[in-house]
Swiss-Prot record:
It is found in: Nucleus. The keyword Coiled coil applies. Keywords: Coiled coil, Developmental protein, DNA-binding, Isopeptide bond, Nucleus, Ubl conjugation. Residues 250-323 form the HTH CENPB-type domain. This is Pogo transposable element with KRAB domain. There is a cross-link at K13, K384 (Glycyl lysine isopeptide (Lys-Gly) (interchain with G-Cter in SUMO2)). The lineage of its organism: Eukaryota, Metazoa, Chordata, Craniata, Vertebrata. It comes from Homo sapiens. GO terms for molecular function: DNA binding. The gene is POGK. Residues 8-28 form a coiled coil. GO terms for biological process: regulation of DNA-templated transcription. Its main location: nucleus. PROSITE patterns: HTH_CENPB (PS51253), KRAB (PS50805).
Amino acid sequence: MESTAYPLNLSLKEEEEEEEIQSRELEDGPADMQKVRICSEGGWVPALFDEVAIYFSDEEWEVLTEQQKALYREVMRMNYETVLSLEFPFPKPDMITRLEGEEESQNSDEWQLQGGTSAENEESDVKPPDWPNPMNATSQFPQPQHFDSFGLRLPRDITELPEWSEGYPFYMAMGFPGYDLSADDIAGKFQFSRGMRRSYDAGFKLMVVEYAESTNNCQAAKQFGVLEKNVRDWRKVKPQLQNAHAMRRAFRGPKNGRFALVDQRVAEYVRYMQAKGDPITREAMQLKALEIAQEMNIPEKGFKASLGWCRRMMRRYDLSLRHKVPVPQHLPEDLTEKLVTYQRSVLALRRAHDYEVAQMGNADETPICLEVPSRVTVDNQGEKPVLVKTPGREKLKITAMLGVLADGRKLPPYIILRGTYIPPGKFPSGMEIRCHRYGWMTEDLMQDWLEVVWRRRTGAVPKQRGMLILNGFRGHATDSVKNSMESMNTDMVIIPGGLTSQLQVLDVVVYKPLNDSVRAQYSNWLLAGNLALSPTGNAKKPPLGLFLEWVMVAWNSISSESIVQGFKKCHISSNLEEEDDVLWEIESELPGGGEPPKDCDTESMAESN
């Protein structure tokens, strides 16, 4: 019965225009080295047996028939003899050693037995392979020219090889012009790996380009171990490499968008606004793109001017977002001493009155701009700081007195409008609205807030004492305000100056998400395209009722969990035992050490406040 034949695909894959390093460690072989040489267009290229060898796993080898195994042995021996006909040193591959061992183990009787068995039926289709003689294999090829004629010399003994450094192919240490390499032992470094394609960052490419400009492309390729074609390509894109990030490795992606004319006109609009000094936001670019799309009769379903389109368009035209660096609050030099004093006052009040979590709160006033100025602008990549103009209406703002409790509840917003009267209109429910000539919080408005917000808060019990944490605004610490709070059975705690960013819950967890939400709603309102224009063509500010609705939506979006965590982070509602540990850690940082925390009476606390 004839055995089933499986097709054997012996194909070699040619990889062009990419550098690869072979990664297969070769075991210590015999000291005698073969000579292999390939001379291609005047340059030396190493030829290795692994480049023309095919390997099978044990499972794959068992599937092959005897005919296929014989064919495989014959092809591998022919490839080996072909590489031997060249002149470049490499040890004998392990595969050839194993094949020679298998050949010796198979005696001639086995082949005669196969021939005799098949002769009983008919002539045998399987013939013993005609192994070429290794000694005569080189006679099939022309004798190569010796290395001396090229000005190169290969040492006969491996001990004659010079030292060469790690990271370079071994053939660069064999006397090739342009290389100055060294190594401890070339036999230990005699290894190649077939790995992934190499990629280079922009910093490396610029270094190669600068070297090529001072010498030539060929010398740069040899110096850095890259292809000369890569050097030519990198020199063509030198401006892009200079403007790109030093770690960028490729410039991929489509060069033109689906609506190239829209992209081009938006880019022209950005340059025009840059020349005028006006700030450009991505929202403004999206609005301009929608306007251009309407002029070009592009359907709304086909082009939406989304944020993703804006990002890709900016990438295609080398635009980036420039952020305004916020000015951080400078902490005082006596930060540790103030922290210890503040922690002692809070601990003393909590131990003296044992406040309920729902009776501890924090309140503060914050300005909210009607027309929120953008903190970013679109500009060319790599540009220096740019000056931009503002619409001049960023000073039109309202003041909001906000309050939160330690159990996560939010008090109704207390809005102070600028003016002598409250303009007519429809305002959202759930907030208190007042007016002031300058839009500021005053002593009278603070007392009004205590009456309409703090006294009426949910869960307020006359017999239960409360604690309210305020900042150092002078309108908070007046005698009339203190008397009003005392009548409401509430203790006042003043945060030390310069520490509100660290100790005030509203600064820690509320203000940033609140302002971000208001800006997002304002941007969506602009993108809707239904804003009114003034006689001069400028966009009018949003209606007051709409803006207050944005503030209410942003206030309701603050989660109760974040407020609870903010009180714990500021060490207001944490466990008293944990507070002692924190106070010990703070006092240990003082220059003179610190004393254990002592319980302070209420009278001394009132004097300190």
